[in-house]
Regions:
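C-terminal domain-tail junction helix/linker
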Residues: 70, 201-245
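Active-site proximal helix-loop segment of RNase H-like, two-metal nucleases, encompassing DDE(D)
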Residues: 109, 179-201, 212-214
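Extended, low-complexity cationic-aromatic segments
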Residues: 3, 39-127, 232-239
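Acidic/histidine-rich, metal-coordinating catalytic segments
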Residues: 137-149, 172
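Conserved short alpha-helical interface segments
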Residues: 1-33, 56, 62-65
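RNase H-like polynucleotidyl transferase catalytic core
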Residues: 85-90, 158-178, 194-196
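Generic beta-sheet signal
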Residues: 57, 137-141, 220
């Protein structure tokens, strides 16, 4: 830039700082094209900020293809001035899929692992949820638009259980499902830091994490209203449309 403009590197850097420009950085974005985007945002955020009485709100999803990875060298432990260190190379030992349902009110999670993530496994997880939640409560399920959540078998399962109410997130809007935030914590605190020499070791580690965190669970707090979210999306769309692209 300095060579192209005839300015010094110091001058270019000063201009970039003055206008908060960071040309070395890039980010990706994806906007939902769901025609019911506004209605779905209001519906789901309403469940977060004002959960219905005598009902459970469960954020449900699956974290698929979790790899059981063994490091090629022992993990070097944390030391003063030095973080825990892992070898870059690893050995794969298969994968598992975690199905999880986050209770919005308590922060506790119902979870189980399966080798695959088809509709059959999802229906079995719904059976697990049904056995775990009190019979006198209605259950509101927040789900994404993954095809396994909408098969005929799943629709029949739901039709036979009128206490269940399904709320689908808008397309391309996984950020609206709070269980995704829990998946981030699981990944950072357990999966990435662990050494798993088999899928059984990985599954045992996930189950242990579930048991320990459920003992001291606290709910995630949703802070933005639907109006604030929609206004933010509208501003972003306006900036994007005026960017000249």
């Amino acid at each position: 830039m300095a060579r192209a403009t005839g300015l010094s590197q110091t001058a270019v850097a000063r201009i970039w700082r003055a206008f908060a420009l960071q040309p070395h950085r890039t980010e990706t974005f994806k906007l939902s094209k769901d025609p019911l985007f506004i209605e779905k945002v209001r519906d789901i955020v309403g469940l977060y900020v004002q959960p219905p009485d005598r009902a459970l709100v469960l954020c449900v999803d699956e974290k698929s293809q979790i790899q059981a990875l063994d490091r090629s060298a022992p993990v070097l432990p944390l030391r003063p001035g030095q973080p825990e260190r892992h070898a870059h190379d690893y050995i794969r030992h298969g994968t598992t899929t975690l199905f999880a349902a986050l209770d919005v009110r308590t922060g506790r999670v119902i979870g189980e692992c399966h080798p695959r993530h088809r509709a059959q496994e999802f229906r079995r997880f719904l059976d697990t949820i049904d056995a775990a939640v009190p019979r006198h409560l209605d259950v509101h399920l927040i789900l994404d638009n993954y095809a396994t959540h909408k098969t005929a078998a799943i629709r029949r399962w739901l039709a036979k259980r009128p206490r269940y109410h399904v709320h689908f997130t808008p397309t391309s809007s996984s950020w609206l499902n709070l269980v995704e935030r829990w998946f981030v914590e699981l990944t950072e605190k357990q999966i990435r830091r662990g050494v798993h020499r088999s899928t059984r070791e990985l599954i045992d580690a996930i189950r242990h994490y579930l048991a320990v965190t459920n003992e001291t669970a606290t709910p995630f707090v949703w802070t933005k209203t639907a109006d604030e979210i929609l206004a933010s999306v509208a501003r972003f769309c306006e900036r994007t449309s005026n960017s000249g692209h």
